[in-house]
Amino acid sequence: MIRTQDISVCTEGGSIQQKKVSDLKNRVQMVERTPNALLLSIHQNYFPEAKYHGAQVFYAKTPGSEALAALLQQTLRTCVDPENHRREKPAEAVYLMEKVSCTAVLVECGFLSNEQEAEKLTQAQYQKQLTGAVCSALCSYLETEGESQ
């Protein structure tokens, strides 16, 4: 599934909370029905304090996830922000990451709560840098993964 709009895949009816839960469950089902799936979830981060910045990658406990996350984190550092010293981390309490059986990562591209980073995240050139880094890392991972199978 590639989203180009902010849409929900929830089951109709119910409260807002029930819709959020059904949306997540339906996403898991979509991933699980897809042969040879790989989940790449891309987000923008937010934290109440504006001092935090930098892209960070989180990974599921499934095979290949940590390796992909490490490659993504390193590529984002190299291609986008050499001063970013964040490290990839396990995704704790993230429903999708806990429920899927495929390789799965969540990329937080930056902090909307940091004024300077929020500004960069709206710029087309910076967005191209981010997507280029993510695509490069993903292609490298898939090439390496293909060789190991």
Language-model segment annotations:
Residues G64-P90:
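Active-site-adjacent substrate-binding region
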Residues C10-E12, Q18-K19, E83-R87, E108-C109:
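Peptidoglycan cell-wall recognition and remodeling modules
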Residues I7-S8, T78, L112-S113:
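Active-site/binding-pocket entry motifs
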Residues M1-A67:
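Catalytic-core regions of hydrolytic enzymes
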Residues K20-R27, S65-L68, L72, E117, ...:
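Stable alpha-helical elements in mature extracytoplasmic
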Residues T34, S41, P48, H85-Q149:
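Active-site-adjacent mobile loop/cap segments within catalytic or ligand-binding domains
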